[in-house]
């Protein structure tokens, strides 16, 4: 090749990069739908959790419900906020399929995905601490395990953590994918 000649391979770089970014955008959109399912499932499972136990007579009853514990209320709110954000971010993710070179919208998603990851981590961690106390108690603090009496309640609150922690992993993957797509531009 002579000085000043244009290589025939040069134009192929842009379509390949756009194709990779388009594939990343498709995966991004799919993972957002899965994360929506995880967060809404966790919020619904925790938000509808309650159990009532009769004690000696029908007039005295013990009740366990998620709203009795602020950590569980925060967990439901955090999952609802993250789920709403994920639903609202779907159109932007679809834009990335149509326009794989979009840069500022990817930066927007990286920023807000990171903020939502922090919120979801805080909510899930707070709830996980209370779930642990419900199962194990704390002898030193005189907090007894309630799961022998409220087994259905404990199963539901434990199960609700699964979707939330799965959504946390998916958000980490989404942030990584967006960073990868941004890095491919340079």
UniProtKB/Swiss-Prot annotation:
Q: Does the keyword Cytoplasm apply?
A: no
Give the keywords, sorted.
Cell membrane, Cell wall biogenesis/degradation, Glycoprotein, Membrane, Transmembrane, Transmembrane helix
Q: Which residues lie on this side of the membrane: Cytoplasmic?
A: 1-23, 95-106, 182-186
TM helices/strands, residue ranges: 24-44, 74-94, 107-127, 161-181
A GO biological-process term = cell wall organization
Q: Does the keyword Lipid biosynthesis apply?
A: no
Q: Per the record, a Pfam family? A: CASP_dom
Q: Name one GO cellular component term.
A: plasma membrane
Under InterPro entries, the record lists: CASP/CASPL (IPR006459), CASP_dom (IPR006702), CASPL (IPR044173)
Residues carrying covalently attached carbohydrate according to the record: 50
Q: Which residues lie on this side of the membrane: Extracellular?
A: 45-73, 128-160
- Which compartments is it annotated to reside in? Cell membrane
Q: Topology with regard to the membrane?
A: Multi-pass membrane protein
Q: Name the family the entry cites.
A: Belongs to the Casparian strip membrane proteins (CASP) family.
The subunit field of the Swiss-Prot or TrEMBL record says:
Homodimer and heterodimers.
What does this protein do, in the record's words? Regulates membrane-cell wall junctions and localized cell wall deposition. Required for establishment of the Casparian strip membrane domain (CSD) and the subsequent formation of Casparian strips, a cell wall modification of the root endodermis that determines an apoplastic barrier between the intraorganismal apoplasm and the extraorganismal apoplasm and prevents lateral diffusion.
Instruction: Please report the name of this protein according to its UniProt entry.
Output: Casparian strip membrane protein 6
Give the source species: Oryza sativa subsp. indica
